[in-house]
Protein backbone atom coordinates (compact mmCIF):
# COMPACT_ATOMS: atom_id res chain seq x y z
CA UNK A 1 0.00 0.00 0.00
CA UNK A 2 1.04 3.60 -0.58
CA UNK A 3 2.52 5.46 2.38
CA UNK A 4 1.66 9.16 2.60
CA UNK A 5 4.51 11.37 3.80
CA UNK A 6 3.38 14.83 4.82
CA UNK A 7 6.38 17.12 4.54
CA UNK A 8 6.44 20.45 6.35
CA UNK A 9 9.09 23.11 6.78
CA UNK A 10 11.16 22.29 9.84
CA UNK A 11 12.00 24.62 12.74
CA UNK A 12 15.13 24.88 14.86
CA UNK A 13 14.67 22.98 18.13
CA UNK A 14 15.53 26.19 19.98
CA UNK A 15 12.25 27.62 18.65
CA UNK A 16 10.28 24.42 19.29
CA UNK A 17 11.60 24.19 22.85
CA UNK A 18 10.32 27.70 23.60
CA UNK A 19 6.84 26.35 22.96
CA UNK A 20 6.14 27.45 19.39
CA UNK A 21 2.76 25.95 18.37
CA UNK A 22 3.76 25.32 14.73
CA UNK A 23 4.55 21.58 15.07
CA UNK A 24 1.21 20.94 16.80
CA UNK A 25 -0.65 23.06 14.24
CA UNK A 26 0.93 21.15 11.34
CA UNK A 27 0.17 17.82 13.03
CA UNK A 28 -3.46 18.91 13.52
CA UNK A 29 -3.67 19.77 9.82
CA UNK A 30 -2.28 16.36 8.87
CA UNK A 31 -4.77 14.66 11.19
CA UNK A 32 -7.66 16.63 9.64
CA UNK A 33 -6.57 15.61 6.13
CA UNK A 34 -6.25 11.98 7.22
CA UNK A 35 -9.73 12.14 8.76
CA UNK A 36 -11.06 13.45 5.46
CA UNK A 37 -9.27 10.63 3.60
CA UNK A 38 -10.71 8.05 5.98
CA UNK A 39 -7.29 6.92 7.22
CA UNK A 40 -7.02 4.56 4.25
CA UNK A 41 -3.23 4.81 3.97
CA UNK A 42 -0.47 4.70 6.54
CA UNK A 43 1.20 8.07 6.96
CA UNK A 44 3.97 10.00 8.66
CA UNK A 45 4.70 13.66 9.24
CA UNK A 46 8.27 14.60 8.42
CA UNK A 47 10.20 17.84 8.19
CA UNK A 48 12.36 19.43 5.52
CA UNK A 49 14.53 22.46 4.71
CA UNK A 50 16.83 22.31 7.70
CA UNK A 51 19.87 24.59 7.42
CA UNK A 52 22.92 25.11 9.57
CA UNK A 53 24.53 23.04 12.29
CA UNK A 54 21.92 23.44 15.04
CA UNK A 55 19.33 20.77 15.87
CA UNK A 56 16.07 20.95 13.90
CA UNK A 57 12.71 19.26 14.20
CA UNK A 58 12.79 15.79 12.64
CA UNK A 59 12.60 13.24 11.23
CA UNK A 60 13.90 14.77 8.05
CA UNK A 61 11.89 14.11 4.91
CA UNK A 62 14.96 12.97 2.96
CA UNK A 63 15.99 10.51 5.70
CA UNK A 64 12.43 9.20 6.04
CA UNK A 65 12.17 8.50 2.30
CA UNK A 66 15.61 6.86 2.16
CA UNK A 67 14.89 4.65 5.17
CA UNK A 68 11.50 3.53 3.85
CA UNK A 69 12.87 2.75 0.38
CA UNK A 70 15.77 0.79 1.91
CA UNK A 71 13.19 -1.27 3.83
CA UNK A 72 11.33 -2.05 0.61
CA UNK A 73 8.54 0.54 0.88
CA UNK A 74 8.80 2.16 -2.54
CA UNK A 75 5.26 3.42 -3.06
CA UNK A 76 5.36 6.82 -1.40
CA UNK A 77 3.49 10.06 -1.98
CA UNK A 78 5.12 13.20 -0.61
CA UNK A 79 2.55 15.82 0.36
CA UNK A 80 4.05 19.29 0.94
CA UNK A 81 1.53 20.09 3.68
CA UNK A 82 2.97 23.46 4.71
CA UNK A 83 3.76 24.68 1.20
CA UNK A 84 0.78 26.09 -0.68
CA UNK A 85 2.62 26.82 -3.92
CA UNK A 86 5.53 25.44 -5.89
CA UNK A 87 8.91 26.99 -5.15
CA UNK A 88 12.47 25.85 -4.41
CA UNK A 89 11.43 23.64 -1.50
CA UNK A 90 9.01 21.64 -3.61
CA UNK A 91 10.43 21.89 -7.13
CA UNK A 92 14.05 21.39 -6.14
CA UNK A 93 14.33 19.94 -2.65
CA UNK A 94 11.55 17.37 -3.02
CA UNK A 95 11.37 16.81 -6.79
CA UNK A 96 15.08 16.93 -7.57
CA UNK A 97 16.87 15.89 -4.39
CA UNK A 98 14.57 13.64 -2.35
CA UNK A 99 12.92 11.80 -5.24
CA UNK A 100 16.22 11.50 -7.12
CA UNK A 101 17.88 9.94 -4.04
CA UNK A 102 14.96 7.53 -3.70
CA UNK A 103 15.32 6.44 -7.31
CA UNK A 104 19.07 5.90 -6.84
CA UNK A 105 18.17 3.55 -3.96
CA UNK A 106 15.82 1.56 -6.21
CA UNK A 107 12.44 3.27 -5.88
CA UNK A 108 12.04 2.91 -9.66
CA UNK A 109 10.02 6.12 -10.07
CA UNK A 110 7.41 5.06 -7.51
CA UNK A 111 8.03 7.99 -5.14
CA UNK A 112 5.78 10.88 -6.20
CA UNK A 113 4.89 14.34 -4.94
CA UNK A 114 1.30 15.52 -4.66
CA UNK A 115 0.63 18.61 -6.71
CA UNK A 116 0.81 21.89 -4.79
CA UNK A 117 -2.32 23.99 -4.47
CA UNK A 118 -0.88 26.90 -6.49
CA UNK A 119 -3.79 28.62 -8.27
CA UNK A 120 -6.46 26.03 -7.50
CA UNK A 121 -9.87 27.70 -7.61
CA UNK A 122 -11.02 25.61 -4.64
CA UNK A 123 -8.00 26.76 -2.61
CA UNK A 124 -8.48 30.41 -3.58
CA UNK A 125 -12.19 30.25 -2.72
CA UNK A 126 -11.31 28.65 0.62
CA UNK A 127 -8.87 31.48 1.40
CA UNK A 128 -11.47 34.04 0.37
CA UNK A 129 -14.07 32.41 2.64
CA UNK A 130 -11.65 32.45 5.58
CA UNK A 131 -10.73 36.09 4.94
CA UNK A 132 -14.39 37.12 4.65
CA UNK A 133 -15.33 35.30 7.86
CA UNK A 134 -12.45 37.02 9.62
CA UNK A 135 -13.42 40.46 8.32
CA UNK A 136 -17.07 39.86 9.22
CA UNK A 137 -16.05 38.91 12.78
CA UNK A 138 -14.67 42.39 13.47
CA UNK A 139 -11.72 40.84 15.31
CA UNK A 140 -8.26 42.13 14.34
CA UNK A 141 -6.70 38.69 14.81
CA UNK A 142 -7.41 35.31 16.35
CA UNK A 143 -7.12 34.85 20.10
CA UNK A 144 -4.34 32.38 19.39
CA UNK A 145 -2.24 35.25 18.02
CA UNK A 146 -2.09 36.88 21.43
CA UNK A 147 -0.70 33.86 23.24
CA UNK A 148 3.08 33.98 23.51
CA UNK A 149 5.15 30.83 23.43
CA UNK A 150 5.78 29.89 27.07
CA UNK A 151 9.55 30.27 26.73
CA UNK A 152 9.57 33.25 24.37
CA UNK A 153 11.94 36.06 25.30
CA UNK A 154 11.84 37.94 21.99
CA UNK A 155 10.92 41.59 22.39
CA UNK A 156 10.13 41.76 18.68
CA UNK A 157 7.60 38.94 19.11
CA UNK A 158 6.06 40.66 22.13
CA UNK A 159 5.76 43.96 20.29
CA UNK A 160 4.13 42.35 17.24
CA UNK A 161 1.56 40.62 19.47
CA UNK A 162 0.84 43.90 21.27
CA UNK A 163 0.43 45.60 17.89
CA UNK A 164 -2.08 43.06 16.56
CA UNK A 165 -4.01 42.88 19.81
CA UNK A 166 -4.12 46.70 19.93
CA UNK A 167 -5.82 46.86 16.55
CA UNK A 168 -9.18 46.05 18.16
CA UNK A 169 -9.12 49.25 20.18
CA UNK A 170 -8.10 51.21 17.09
CA UNK A 171 -10.88 49.57 15.08
CA UNK A 172 -13.43 50.32 17.79
CA UNK A 173 -12.21 53.93 18.03
CA UNK A 174 -12.51 54.37 14.26
CA UNK A 175 -16.05 52.97 14.26
CA UNK A 176 -17.19 55.35 17.01
CA UNK A 177 -15.73 58.46 15.34
Regions found by a protein language model. Give the residues of each.
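Active-site-proximal alpha-helix that buttresses catalytic centers in soluble enzyme cores
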Residues: 1-177
Amino acid sequence: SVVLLYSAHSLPMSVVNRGDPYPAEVAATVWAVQQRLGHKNPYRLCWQSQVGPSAWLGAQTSDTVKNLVKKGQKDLVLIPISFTSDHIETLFEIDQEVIHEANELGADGRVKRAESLNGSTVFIQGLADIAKAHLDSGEPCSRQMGLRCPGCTSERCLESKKFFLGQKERTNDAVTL
